[in-house]
């Protein structure tokens, strides 16, 4: 780009943050997927949850609204990053304690709409980013959608994507949050699917609920 010019003809080119998108941009983009005639999608991923709690809830709610409008797709939601991790200015990350994380996750999902078109997961995985040669924490919504896609392809859509045979999470070194039985009970009773690590089984999806807030024939992903 040396010697180049911007659209105004000036040479004061800047690139920092040029590809960054705000929550308004994401929500605006998601609106396009309400058009079922032009866009064919099965899974709507929340993607990055780097924003604060309220902003992340807004993006999650939009994903759900789009899936509800389409009625032929499912939204996959992860909590906001700060529910699990404390980032400091020197580039290191501290993982919050298990009780704080549990309360944060429950608080994040509590106001989200009850829906059969959404799937809520419990967190973040630690993985190797081969493009930047570093390890980083990423939200699990893409992985949960992946277990559903894999199950659709290798078995049938009405099979559960959870468990040790079909719910394996790939490319994961560890979890930011590995809920025990007490935490899993609290999460699952609040329509949140735990992702856990267990010796011998690795990291797996341990639940197959939809985001429906009441018992129903439609409160499971595989129905």
Residue ranges and their predicted role:
Residues 1-223:
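A glycine- and small-residue-enriched flexible loop/hinge signal that marks low-structured segments
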